[in-house]
C-alpha cells in the first residue's frame, strides 16, 4: 500500500463494493501506539494485527500483519481470535513486558530451549496458533513435526514490544520455511507466567514489490 490517503484509497478501489468487513476483538494502548487484533474480510477472510501511531490525536503511521483465516479450529478447538480479551493488571504492564521480552530473546531468538519451562505454569498454556495444540506439550509436538518435514523457523530480530496490563505484543523478523517473515505474537500473562498466545505469520514481499519504501518494521 502506498503512503497517505491516496495509497489507502487506491487499495479500497480494488475491493468489490461493500465487501470489506472488520471485527476488532482486542485493543491495547502503549504510549503513542494503539494495537488492534481483528478479523477481516479484506480480499478474503483474514486475521490481522494493526499498529497505529498517533500524534496530536491523529493517526500518522500504520503497520499491519495479516494471515489467511483458517477454515477449521486448531487441534485444541481454538480459533485465531477467541479467548480472553479484557485488559487487566495495568500496574503490571512493565514487569509483564520484561517477562515476555526475556522469553522471546532467550528462547525464540537465541534458541535456549532448556529455559522454556521457566516462563510457563506447567502445561497450562492456551494456544491460538492454527496448527498447534494447547500446552508446552502441544508446542513441542508441533516443533517436532516441523523438523520431520524439514520446515525451519527462526526469529532473528525483535523490532518492537508493546503492552498494556496482561497483554504484550512482540513484533519480530526472521525466517519461516526459508522465506523472510514477519512474526507478530500476542501473549497474555497471569501471575508472572505466560498463559495464552495468539499470532500471525506473514511472508515479507521482495523489496521490488513494495508499494512504499517504509518496510514492515521501521519503528
What are these regions (language model features)?
Residues 1-219:
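C-terminal and inter-domain tail/linker signature
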Amino acid at each position: 500500500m502506498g503512503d497517505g490517503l491516496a495509497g489507502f484509497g487506491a487499495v479500497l478501489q480494488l475491493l468489490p463494493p461493500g465487501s470489506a468487513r472488520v471485527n476488532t476483538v482486542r485493543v491495547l494502548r502503549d504510549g503513542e501506539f494503539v494495537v488492534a487484533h481483528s478479523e477481516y474480510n479484506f480480499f478474503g477472510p483474514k486475521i490481522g494485527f494493526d499498529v497505529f501511531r498517533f500524534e496530536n490525536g491523529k493517526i500518522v503511521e500504520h503497520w499491519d500483519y495479516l494471515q489467511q483465516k483458517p477454515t477449521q479450529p486448531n487441534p485444541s478447538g481454538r480459533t485465531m481470535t477467541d479467548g480472553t480479551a479484557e485488559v487487566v493488571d495495568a500496574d503490571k504492564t512493565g514487569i509483564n513486558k520484561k517477562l515476555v521480552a526475556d522469553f522471546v530473546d532467550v528462547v525464540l531468538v537465541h534458541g535456549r530451549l532448556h529455559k522454556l519451562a521457566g516462563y510457563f505454569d506447567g502445561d497450562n498454556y492456551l494456544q491460538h496458533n492454527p496448527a498447534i495444540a494447547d500446552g508446552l506439550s502441544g508446542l513441542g509436538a508441533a516443533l517436532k513435526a516441523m523438523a520431520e518435514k524439514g520446515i525451519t523457523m527462526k526469529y532473528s530480530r525483535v523490532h518492537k514490544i508493546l503492552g498494556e496490563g496482561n497483554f504484550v505484543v512482540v513484533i519480530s523478523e526472521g525466517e519461516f520455511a526459508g522465506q523472510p517473515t514477519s512474526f507478530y505474537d500476542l501473549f497474555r500473562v497471569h501471575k508472572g507466567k505466560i498463559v495464552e498466545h495468539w499470532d500471525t505469520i506473514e511472508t515479507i514481499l521482495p523489496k521490488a514489490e513494495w508499494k512504499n519504501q517504509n518496510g514492515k518494521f521501521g519503528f
